[in-house]
């Protein structure tokens, strides 16, 4: 009877997992035009925002230096540029447009993520009964396994998340989160996260193995340590 109830619950879990991608794709298409019109209307009175100004100014100085160098190579006597040449002006406008697109990307992804989070929270709340049934079935399935198989699965999960090669996976994950949210990558934050989070997670898993599994099945803990130390 529990297995029959677990199948709809499992399908509901698959639906929840796939829901964010479907919602993100749908709302990206719906919100993109509206956000673009709103942003362009808001930016119609100014070409550069305060956020863009520093980046564009740095790029302008680079272009101006390149232009002066080019004039010196051509042996023109007047190498001091009073006004930006047309090519540099076009480059500045192009940089402003690129920055605008970046800000639109951030706003669009932030909006869709908020909507996804709201829908996902509602789905968890409305499907609480199905998730409880699925959780009880998974626990029953796990407890019915012999201790060797349990130890194998526990070791597989722990090595997957906190093993030697897991740091690369965590780095890819946080980079994906930054890219999805439209944030500027920060290598310092990436390094701190990759160095600290797996260690914290490993400590929590060891605590769970020692204190929780030891009460459930001492032989399971012995088998787990024998396999991990082999």
From Swiss-Prot:
Ranges annotated as spanning the membrane: 7-27, 106-126, 145-165, 181-201
GO annotation (BP), single: potassium ion transport
One Pfam assignment: CemA
Membrane topology field: Multi-pass membrane protein
Cellular component aspect of the GO annotation: chloroplast inner membrane; plastid
Main localization, broad class: plastid
PANTHER family: CHLOROPLAST ENVELOPE MEMBRANE PROTEIN, CHLOROPLAST ENVELOPE MEMBRANE PROTEIN-RELATED
Family: Belongs to the CemA family.
Record's protein name: Potassium/proton antiporter CemA
Source organism of this protein record: Oryza sativa subsp. indica
């Amino acid at each position: 009877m529990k297995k029959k109830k677990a199948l709809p619950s499992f399908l509901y879990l698959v639906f929840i997992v796939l829901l964010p991608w479907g919602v993100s794709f749908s709302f990206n298409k719906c919100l993109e035009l509206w956000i673009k019109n709103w942003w362009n209307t808001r930016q119609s009175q100014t070409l550069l925002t305060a956020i863009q100004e520093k980046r564009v100014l740095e790029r302008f100085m680079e272009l101006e230096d390149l232009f002066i160098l080019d004039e010196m190579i051509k042996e023109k006597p007047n190498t001091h540029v009073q006004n930006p040449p047309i090519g540099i002006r076009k480059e500045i406008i192009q940089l402003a447009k690129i920055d605008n697109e970046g800000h639109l990307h951030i706003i669009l992804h932030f909006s869709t993520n908020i909507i996804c989070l709201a829908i996902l929270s509602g789905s968890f709340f409305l499907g609480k009964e199905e998730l409880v049934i699925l959780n009880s079935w998974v626990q029953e399935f796990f407890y019915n396994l012999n201790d060797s198989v349990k130890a194998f699965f526990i070791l597989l999960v722990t090595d997957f998340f906190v093993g030697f090669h897991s740091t690369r996976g965590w780095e890819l994950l946080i980079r994906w989160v930054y890219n999805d949210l439209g944030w500027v990558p920060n290598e310092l934050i990436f390094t701190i996260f990759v160095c600290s989070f797996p260690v914290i997670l490993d400590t929590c898993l060891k605590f769970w193995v020692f204190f929780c599994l030891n009460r459930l099945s001492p032989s399971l803990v012995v088998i787990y340590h024998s396999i991990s130390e082999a």
